[in-house]
């Protein structure tokens, strides 16, 4: 894709559905680049606004920094012209900066900054963490508010003032009051991403808060359904959305909730169901069993 400013990338990402591809692994757990690139090409035939390589759905937490760079590089090389590829950065500040620089080497068009690893920090510490990462790269940065990195409205406003390349805020907490406060303070200076697990569950009410897009993991294996659902959300078609929730999304979430970590495992199971297997999940995650796989297959038939 031709060189685009962080603001151009933000406008593109905020205008459509966001794809979070799985990372393909062989039986021995190694990265299967050929299969991954084929999947990226297949997803590129559908109308996503951006592709987030090696994110949470892509098992970022189980990949080494070198593997993350390899996955991002493969995504950049295979993604169709004009589709932004966003790379992850995370862990402590120093490691996140290294990963941001690796994203630049790989040719990524932006960065999703995941929460720091295994530590608690106050708002001053979180602001400084984001500020340092933003200062270390020319790429646009999207900050992910989740778990141990829950950003307050004043913190987000300060970051928007201090970091010209902070372009987006992804919410993985689901606090409606907090999102309302953030949008009231920051407004359209950032674009907003719904980032709760199976974000389709929250997409319609979040639209009213200025959240115009969300991370779709199910796009991996039911891309047309995911796009139809997103378009219904954007046109405020509540009857369509509610019917789709009842028919597929809610029972899918019930299956997802049976085991911790199934939010990722069930996506790879969906890939198996449609005949495009992506390999196993890495430990400590576990794959769905045969009975659960059959349940998922029945659900997929309803929307395929």
UniProtKB/Swiss-Prot annotation:
Transmembrane region positions? none
UniProt keyword annotation of Membrane present: no
Pathway involvement?
A: Carbohydrate acid metabolism; D-glucarate degradation; 2,5-dioxopentanoate from D-glucarate: step 2/2
Q: Which InterPro entries match?
A: Aldolase_TIM, DapA-like, Dehydro-deoxyglucarate_dehyd
Any signal peptide, and if so, which residues?
A: none
Q: State its Enzyme Commission number(s).
A: 4.2.1.41
Under CDD domains, the record lists: KDGDH
Identify a single GO molecular function assigned to this protein: 5-dehydro-4-deoxyglucarate dehydratase activity
Keywords for the protein's UniProt record, in alphabetical order:
Lyase
Question: So what does this thing catalyse?
Answer: 5-dehydro-4-deoxy-D-glucarate + H(+) = 2,5-dioxopentanoate + CO2 + H2O
What Gene3D superfamilies does its record include?
A: Aldolase class I
Q: Which Pfam families match?
A: DHDPS
Q: Work out whether the entry's keyword set contains Endoplasmic reticulum.
A: no
Q: What class of enzyme is it?
A: lyase
Which BP terms does GO give this entry? D-glucarate catabolic process
Task: State the similarity comment.
Answer: Belongs to the DapA family.
The identity of this protein, by name, is: Probable 5-dehydro-4-deoxyglucarate dehydratase
Query: What is the organism lineage in this UniProt record?
Result: Bacteria, Bacillati, Actinomycetota, Actinomycetes, Mycobacteriales
């Amino acid at each position: 894709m031709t060189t685009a400013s962080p603001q151009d990338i933000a406008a593109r990402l905020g205008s459509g559905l966001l794809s979070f591809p799985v990372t393909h692994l062989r039986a021995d757990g190694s990265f299967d680049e050929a299969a991954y690139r084929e999947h990226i090409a297949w997803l590129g035939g559908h109308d996503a606004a951006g592709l987030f390589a090696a994110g949470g759905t892509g098992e970022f937490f189980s990949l080494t920094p070198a593997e993350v760079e390899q996955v991002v590089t493969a995504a950049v090389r295979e993604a169709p012209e004009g589709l932004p590829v966003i790379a992850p950065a995370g862990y402590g500040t120093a490691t996140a900066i290294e990963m941001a620089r690796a994203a630049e080497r790989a040719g990524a068009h932006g960065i999703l900054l995941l929460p720091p690893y295994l530590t608690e920090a106050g708002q001053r510490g979180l602001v400084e963490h984001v500020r340092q990462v933003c200062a270390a790269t020319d790429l646009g940065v999207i900050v992910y508010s989740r778990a141990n990195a829950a950003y307050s409205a004043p913190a987000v406003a300060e970051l928007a003032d201090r970091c010209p390349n902070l372009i987006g805020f992804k919410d993985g907490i689901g606090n409606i009051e907090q999102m309302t406060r953030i949008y009231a303070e920051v407004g359209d200076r950032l674009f907003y991403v719904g980032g709760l697990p199976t974000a389709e569950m929250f997409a319609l009410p979040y639209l009213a808060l200025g959240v115009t897009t969300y991370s779709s993991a199910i796009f991996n294996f039911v891309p047309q359904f995911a796009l139809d659902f997103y378009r219904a959300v954007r046109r405020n078609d509540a009857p369509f959305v509610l019917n789709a929730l009842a028919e597929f999304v809610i029972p899918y979430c019930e299956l997802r909730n049976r085991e911790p970590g199934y939010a990722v495992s069930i996506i790879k199971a969906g890939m198996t169901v449609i005949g495009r297997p992506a390999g196993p999940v890495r430990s400590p995650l576990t794959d769905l069993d045969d009975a659960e796989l059959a349940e998922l297959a029945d659900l997929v038939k309803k929307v395929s």
